[in-house]
Amino acid sequence: MNKVHKPLYFYLMLFFSTTIIGALLLYLPFTGKKPISFLDALFIASSAFTVTGLSPVDIESQFNILGEIVILLLIQIGGLGIVTVTLLTLVFLNRKISMKNRFLIMVTWNIDEPGGVIKLIKHLAIYSLVTELIGMICLCLSFIPKFGIGKGLFLSLFTSVSAFNNAGFAIFKNNLIDYSSDPIVIITISILIIFGGIGHFVVIDFINCKKLSKLSLHSKLVLTTTSILIIIGAITFFLLEQFNTMQHMGLVEKIGNSFFQSVTTRTAGFNSIDIASINKSTALMLMLLMFIGGAPLSAAGGIKITTFAVAFIFVLNYIRKENNVSVFNKEISDKHIKLSIVTINISFLFISIITFILSIINPNISLIKLLFEVVSAFGTVGLSMNLTTEYHGITKIIIIFVMLCGKVGLLTLLRTFIPPKNPKNYRYTKGQIYL
């Protein structure tokens, strides 16, 4: 086996084994209020560990407090990354971190250099826990008066962890629809999703930077693209849904929920309106946002906003016939341009193939609903048009596979199982192709 591939295989085995252990715990009688099939338990464990949020059952009515804690832990471990949690444990025990383990972190977070890996995971853990704690305290202001101290604290903790890790799991029957008019819940969760979706690197860079102009290119691209997508998404959602799913709301509430749905759609999957009732045009817009996702080095899914931004800038510069691809007075390398184009293409192809297969298996379900579910699973978002509870066996297995591919990354999987070619010492002559 190729030396480079050994850590990748280990990472995948660690990933899959954690999912199986989570499924077994959810399947056992002591974590549930009623029996559950192992496939449903596996689906929920996969959804929690990939921080997706899709579920074939109602979490509150299916699981007791122990089951909900298992889901909470899967979300937290999945958000931080199983490798990150493992290495944090080794650091806590004062164990030496080998180059193999450093390479695992590089694979998990798509880092090019092994230097500073330990510092990275320490900052990541502190940033995550502190932000989740602050979010929990804010949510307590709304949940404790309604549910009491005990349940209110747990609901606040669960929702804060779920929001920051962009999971979208909620221990409420209608997700957050009943809280669409609660500014504390809507604003707090929106902020948690944004901070979880842009990643700790950007936040630390922003805090340490005295001038915005001194921000790194990565931070500038993430913050700019995130802001643009949130604004465009909110305005579009408001225009398309103000007389549909939000017709019963006042103007301020419509604006707040439009902002919330724009934020949560790109990766978190909470919903304050009925997704099954949205217009087809809205569904298409949400699918685009889900496909793009959040930032690298974060809990977010999708192809990543930097991938989208680089590809968009490349196309724009190509149309303008500019030789170099640059943004914020920095040139983008050919390596990153190729990576962004490849990522978008294989992701689009993967989603198309999976949707085609599901359309054959589920001929009675409309194509746009199937496509919505696949994009949601691949982007580890968790929004659903109420189809998740209707999945039969083979469909659930396929969606589990899609969620895992979305979390691990298609390129990581392909590079793991497809051996690299040995570099050639020669080049062929160029041929003519008509496009």
What are these regions (language model features)?
Residues 1-435:
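Membrane-proximal intracellular helices of multi-pass ion channels
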